[in-house]
């Protein structure tokens, strides 16, 4: 896969985790308490899911993590 995979993550305030999914990587849904942990999981899951979907990458898979979190002022 030479194209960039876009991964969207939104903060789940009730569960206190980032929830991520991607239209570019079928089956990708994961969560983690920090964006750093989320990135670590994505680096493993993206190539695994691509292989399961018969889209084995020739090398590293580039991805962009887009985060969204809503907050309120005090």
List where the protein language model places each region.
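Short, charged, surface-exposed hinge/linker loops at domain edges
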Residues: 1-8, 25, 36-74
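Short aromatic-glycine-(Arg/Gly/Cys) micro-motifs in beta-strand/loop hairpins
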Residues: 10-23
């Amino acid at each position: 896969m030479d194209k960039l995979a876009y991964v969207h993550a939104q903060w789940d305030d009730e569960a206190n985790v980032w929830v991520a999914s991607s239209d570019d990587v079928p089956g990708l849904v994961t969560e983690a308490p920090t964006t750093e942990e989320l990135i670590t999981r994505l680096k493993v899951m993206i190539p695994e899911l691509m292989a399961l979907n018969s889209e084995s990458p020739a090398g590293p898979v580039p991805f962009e993590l887009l985060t969204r979190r809503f907050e309120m002022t005090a």
